[in-house]
Amino acid sequence: MYDFEFEEIAMSTWAMLRQTWIAVNKTAEVKLAKVGLTPEKAAVLWACRDYSGTLTPAEIARLVFRENQTIAGLLNRMENEGLVTRVPKRKGHPFTEVKITPKGEKLAGP
């Protein structure tokens, strides 16, 4: 991808890592698109499937390295697609819980 060299080893290392990430992400995008997912949606589904304990939007954001606002929008879309459900705040519980649906489980794979 880059056809030039950096003088500093740190920049060369960064460039190689960045190229690797881009290649891996593109491959993931293509494969996940075949089942109607994006890498971001897949990461949320895997977090919902594999996390032990109560999973909140804030915890999902932390697990998938995204901002809370980004996750809120993503969860809205995923809930509309039937991939996750959000259980509203209940008395004595200060947060919304996110759960994977059977459809989400199927797409998340084994």
Question: What are the language-model segments listed below?
Answer:
Residues F4-E8, S12, F95, K99, ...:
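A structural signal for alpha-helical segments
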Residues M1-V35:
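N-terminal leader segment of winged-helix/HTH proteins
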Residues I9, T13, E40-K41, T56, ...:
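N-terminal positioning helix adjacent to the helix-turn-helix/winged-helix DNA-binding module
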Residues E7-A10, K41, D50, L83-R86:
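Short acidic/polar alpha-helix capping motifs at helix-coil junctions
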Residues G109-P110:
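Terminal interaction helix/tail motif
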Residues S52-E105:
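Canonical helix-turn-helix DNA-binding module
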Residues I22, K26-T70, K91:
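N-terminal helix-turn-helix DNA-binding core of bacterial DNA-binding proteins
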